[in-house]
């Protein structure tokens, strides 16, 4: 008896997230090739492509229910390549190869990225973390570090040579970025950022402006992103400290948390720092 021919097996979509991760590694390594060929624009574009793929692969894995231990390990290795090794080598080849200290600072950056990723993986398996910990990074995330590094190249592309291309400024900036990567400073995760409904229209307008700037002034946009990210750090620290002091709101939604904070401010209108400094409300008698 002749059996029925087997149908062609469909493509297993569960490999798609890992395929995207591998593509991001290819983009990151190809960026180094273009940097060696003195094509910094192409190198920066490929690093951006690697970052986009890195941001999408995890979401695709969750949508397809294709999360696995192997996928997580590949993703971590991809981050080390794309946001550690690649930005370090691109910046070294493009701007720092003339000075011996250049190799030292980019090596420091790459090592700090690896250490930061190792700590992140360890914290993921730590069951003792408080409930709010998943809303914050510990230290600067690796993609933000890569943007900080590429920002130096963006300054040169936009304005040419200047004090911003001096070895002292470059070394200071790269070292500072490396310290932020391995620091314990809390920084907000994007998925944990909530926007009140009355600010939604303004946010859409800002996104439209950023989309236009990405075409008209991409190098300046990189620095707008860097400055905005640096400015958010004090607010992230304040938010993390407030959450640590209010465990009763750990499971609340952002809207409920904002209501609790407003009520707390109304109940305690004077900040502790004002009391320590002996400050008083204008018009109030001593």
Curated annotation (Swiss-Prot):
It is found in: Cell membrane. The chain crosses the membrane at residues 15-35, 74-94, 95-115, 135-155, 167-187, 207-227. It is a multi-pass membrane protein. One of its GO terms (molecular function) is CDP-diacylglycerol-serine O-phosphatidyltransferase activity. One of its GO terms (cellular component) is plasma membrane. GO terms for biological process: phospholipid biosynthetic process. Its EC number is 2.7.8.8. The keyword Transmembrane applies. Its main location: membrane. Keywords: Cell membrane, Lipid biosynthesis, Lipid metabolism, Membrane, Phospholipid biosynthesis, Phospholipid metabolism, Transferase, Transmembrane, Transmembrane helix. InterPro entries: CDP-alcohol_PTase-I (IPR050324), CDP-diaglyc--ser_O-PTrfase (IPR004533), CDP-OH_P_trans (IPR000462), CDP-OH_PTrfase_TM_dom (IPR043130), CDP_ALCOHOL_P_TRANSF_CS (IPR048254). It catalyses: a CDP-1,2-diacyl-sn-glycerol + L-serine = a 1,2-diacyl-sn-glycero-3-phospho-L-serine + CMP + H(+). The keyword Lipid biosynthesis applies. It holds the Pfam family CDP-OH_P_transf. PROSITE patterns: CDP_ALCOHOL_P_TRANSF (PS00379). NCBIfam families: pssA (TIGR00473). Belongs to the CDP-alcohol phosphatidyltransferase class-I family. This is CDP-diacylglycerol--serine O-phosphatidyltransferase.
